[in-house]
Amino acid sequence: MKIKEDKVMAVVKELFRGEQGGAVSFGDYTLNKKTKKEDIEFSGDLYKVKTFYEITKLEKNGAFVYESVPGTAVENFAVKEDGISFQVAGYRDCEITVELEESTQYVISFTGEQHGLMETNRSGKLSIGVELEEGKDVEVSIVKR
């Protein structure tokens, strides 16, 4: 799979980047082969990222945090007391799975518009479909109800 370089919005070429305030940015959906970076220290935690055009996955201290199929670029992924928020970009629509509190309801919003209420399963995972258009990012907000 070859992504057109002229249409790509910002990807995280270094695969993982810590941001001010504790947020993280990660992922490069333009890569043709699976690439990973492990044992990344940031704010007292250890991160691991795997990414390429088919999948992007983030782990924190050995635990699942984020996964998208196909791969994406994620900026300003911030975990807050009441949920998470981030910007995501990719070359086509994707399914994103995140780890949150188990059996809890969350309001899902894309670029400021509410798109419904979802409940995590007993393991705390929540999966959402995000419509992506190459060259444009989508702001995702998942807030506890």
Task: Tell me the role of every PLM-derived stretch.
Residues 36-58, 66-68, 94-96, 120-145:
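C-terminal beta-strand-rich structural cap/linker in extracellular carbohydrate-active enzymes
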Residues 74-76, 83-86, 116-118, 127-131:
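Beta-strand-rich interaction surfaces with strong enrichment in secreted/lumenal proteins
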